A protein has these predicted regions:
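Hydrophobic alpha-helical segments, chiefly the membrane-spanning helices
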Residues: 1-336
Length: 336
C-alpha cells in the first residue's frame, strides 16, 4: 500500500511538470500562429489534455480485461465520468485557486461568445447522448444516427471556433506568451519546430503521468474493493482530468481566464461528442441508476455555468457551487 501512495505522489509531480511544459509551449504556438485564446484553449489545449481520459475507454473497449462486461463498464464509466468531473470538481478547483485574490464576489471572465458556444454545444450533445440511452439495442439505425449527429456537432463546433478566431484576435483576445519557452533556456531557438517538440514532450509526459496515476488509483481501489463501474465513474476521472485541472489553475492564476476556462469547456465538448458516439455504438449504453445520476448532475452543472455566462463574467461563488454537484453525486452513489 505504501508503494502505491509513493507511485501516486511521483506521478502527480510528473503531471505538474508536464502541464507547465505543455501550457508554455501552447502559449508560444498560439502566439506564433496568431490565433485566439479560444482556439488555443478550447481546441488545442482541450484535445491535448484529453488524451489520458480518451485512452481509458478506448483501451478498455479494445479488451482491457478478459471480461467483456467489465470492459464495457469501464468504457461507459470513463466516457461519462470525465464530463462530470470537468463540469463540477474541476470548475470548483479553478475558482478556488483565485478566491483569495479575487474574493467570492469576484469574477472569472472568459471571452463570452466562445464560452457560450462551448456550453451550448456541450448541452446539445450531452442531451443527445442521454436520449440514446433509452433507444433499444436492436434499433441500431437510430443509435447510429445519434452517434453521427454527435460527430457532426463536433465538426461544426471546430469550424465555428476557427471562424471566430480572426475577429477575436483583432479585438485583443489573441494568444500571448508571457514567458520565454522552456527549451530556449537550454540553448534551443524559439521556432515552430522547437515549439512542436516541446508540445510533444509535454503531451508525452501528461499521458505517461496520467497512465501511471491511473495505475496507482486502480491499485488502491482494488485494495478497497471498489467496483469497475464506480472506479471508472468516480476514481479514474480524478486522475485522467488532472492535466485539465492543473493547466486551468496555472492559467487562471496568470489572469488568462479564456485559456483556463476554454481548456475545461473545450474538453467537455470533445468528451461530450466524440466519446459518447463511440459508447453508443460499442457499449450497452443503458440508463443504469448510477450512470443516469451522473448524467443528470453533469447536465445541471453545465446548465448552471451557461445561465451564469454574463457579460461581466462568471461569479466565483457560482462556480464554487458546482463543487456541490460532485459532492452530491458521491453521496448519492456511495449510499447505494
Amino acid at each position: 500500500m505504501t508503494f502505491m501512495f509513493v507511485e501516486l505522489a511521483f506521478m502527480l509531480i510528473v503531471i505538474l511538470v508536464a502541464a507547465e511544459v505543455f501550457t508554455n509551449a501552447l502559449e508560444h504556438l498560439g502566439e506564433r500562429l496568431k490565433i485566439s485564446e479560444g482556439v488555443t484553449g478550447s481546441l488545442f489545449a482541450a484535445v491535448g489534455t484529453a488524451l489520458p481520459e480518451t485512452m481509458v475507454p478506448l483501451l478498455a473497449l479494445a479488451g482491457g480485461t478478459s471480461s467483456q462486461a467489465v470492459n464495457e463498464e469501464i468504457g461507459v464509466g470513463a466516457i461519462l465520468g470525465a464530463p462530470l468531473m470537468l463540469a463540477t470538481l474541476t470548475t470548483f478547483l479553478m475558482a478556488l485557486a483565485v478566491i483569495r485574490s479575487r474574493g467570492p464576489r469576484g469574477t472569472i471572465t472568459p471571452e463570452r461568445t466562445g464560452f457560450v458556444r462551448d456550453m451550448n454545444t456541450f448541452l446539445a450533445a450531452f442531451s443527445l447522448a442521454t436520449v440514446a440511452m433509452f433507444v433499444p439495442h436492436h434499433n441500431w439505425a437510430v443509435r447510429a444516427l445519434l452517434a453521427a449527429m454527435l460527430v457532426g456537432l463536433y465538426v461544426m463546433y471546430v469550424v465555428l471556433t476557427f471562424r471566430a478566431s480572426t475577429r477575436l484576435v483583432d479585438a485583443g483576445h489573441g494568444t500571448e506568451a508571457p514567458h520565454a519557452m522552456l527549451l530556449s533556456r537550454v540553448g534551443l531557438p524559439t521556432n515552430l519546430a522547437t515549439i512542436v517538440l516541446q508540445l510533444l514532450i509535454g503531451v508525452a509526459l501528461l499521458v505517461g503521468g496520467a497512465k501511471g496515476f491511473i495505475h496507482g488509483v486502480e491499485g488502491v481501489s482494488h485494495v478497497l474493493g471498489v467496483s469497475a463501474l464506480l472506479l471508472s465513474l468516480i476514481i479514474v476521472p480524478i486522475a485522467t482530468e488532472l492535466p485539465e485541472k492543473v493547466n486551468s489553475v496555472l492559467w487562471i492564476r496568470r489572469g488568462k481566464d479564456t485559456l483556463a476556462f476554454g481548456n475545461i469547456t473545450g474538453a467537455m465538448v470533445f468528451q461530450g461528442t466524440l466519446l459518447p458516439a463511440i459508447g453508443i455504438m460499442l457499449t450497452p449504453w443503458e440508463p443504469r441508476p448510477e450512470v443516469l445520476t451522473g448524467v443528470i448532475i453533469t447536465l445541471a452543472a453545465a446548465a448552471w455555468l451557461r445561465v451564469n455566462a454574463r457579460t461581466r463574467g462568471l461569479a466565483i461563488w457560482a462556480l464554487l457551487a458546482n463543487g456541490a454537484g460532485y459532492a452530491g453525486y458521491l453521496a448519492v452513489t456511495l449510499a447505494r
